[in-house]
Amino acid sequence: MPGPGSTLRLLAAVLALALLAAACGDSSGGAGTATPASPSSTSGSPTTVAAPSSSTEPSTTTTVVAPTVNLTEGCVENYTEGVDYFPQKLTVEDAERLGVTYEDNYKVVRVSDANFEEAAFTYVLVQCGTPAPELTDDLAGATVVEVPISSAVVMSTTMLPGLAEIGRLDIVKGLDSFDYVSTPAVLDLIEAGDLVATGSLSFGFDAEAMAAAEPDVAFTFLFGPAADELAPLEGLGIPAAVSADYRENTPLGRAEWMKFPALFINEEAAVTDLYDGIATEYGDLVEKAATAAERPTVLLDKATDGVWNVAGGGSYAARFIADAGGDYIFSDVEGNSSEQLDIETVLERASDADFWLNPGFGVSSLMDLEAADPRHAKFAAFERGDVWNNDLRVNANFGNDYFETGAAHPELVLGDLIAILHPELAPDHEFVFYRRLQ
């Protein structure tokens, strides 16, 4: 029989085992295993914003999926502050009189030097269904337009090719005139009776026709004072979107104005693709022309009543000649406007010019040129038959597609010019706008 000491030792061992078992069974998880933390990811996650909460309610968040493309029709249904509603943006590279900046739900379009008064305009294009900003500081006096617009009257044919090529002629409800249009898809709309003619703002304006078109915007341009020319639209409460494309002095600068109407319909992606292709082809042609062995001399225009309007060396026409690998004889005339010289002065400087381009409206033959002034026949280019006019595509109303499609597609004009000045570089060229006078 065990003694008292043995009994005490046995009780101590049992107590120790009980304490050890209790210690091993005590766990905060109850099962002895930790729950792993949920992984987090920021890749491709939607925009989240915190919903308003009070001190007595639990905080909640609402997941908002930001748009990945611009809304080209309709309005935002549920506006959320902080969401970028213009994920597809554009930049202006070549046009000096057009600019655009973006905020989350509106864009600011600025037009400068729109006429001889150097008129400037600011447009705040607000995504429909979102709040307009306060027009303070540099936005004071801006014209606010909800975009995308669904209807417009276009009072400049230079905008038509771009709208046609991005497939958005659906917004065009009227033109100032049907007479001078060349774009085939627009001619189809005219033939179908789908458009109204409003007359120009400065001559023959038809207020009833303009009102009947119910345009969100009227795209136009200015020659005279802005206050006078835009008054008819202001009287109808129709916003005027003023283009300054014809004030640009480079071919690509003018062509890039196709982006102007596209900004009003949120078609940044489509018009950027179109313009980038044009600019790339134009650049390739400039490089091609630069490989020519010689740079022929070029004369422009003609005399009227013994006076020759000589284009400046910084003009649109002069830039075309330079890019085509030619030397414009009057490149030393400063600026982009013309200088008036008498025909004898021009003869003295340019009688031996290699080529004579753009003698102008109403000159269909060498005979017409000589009839306008017999001294025209004294130029060597006339004697050789190296006189070319840009009137190959003129309609029955004397609308010249050179000023429509040619403005939107300067690469086509440049291709013609290279084929004239450097035929060895384009032996199989088919002319689009130019023809040799006979």
Segments (PLM) and residue ranges:
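C-terminal motif of bacterial Sec signal peptides marking the signal peptidase cleavage site
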Residues: 18-23
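Residue-identity detector for glycine
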Residues: 3-5, 30-32, 44
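Post-signal peptide N-terminal segment of mature Sec-exported envelope proteins
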Residues: 33-60, 65-74
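Bacterial N-terminal signal peptides that target proteins for export
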Residues: 1-11
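Hydrophobic helical h-region of N-terminal Sec-dependent signal peptides
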Residues: 13-17
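N-terminal ligand-binding lobe of clamshell/alpha-beta domains
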Residues: 25-26, 58-438
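Bacterial lipoprotein signal-peptidase II cleavage site
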Residues: 24-35
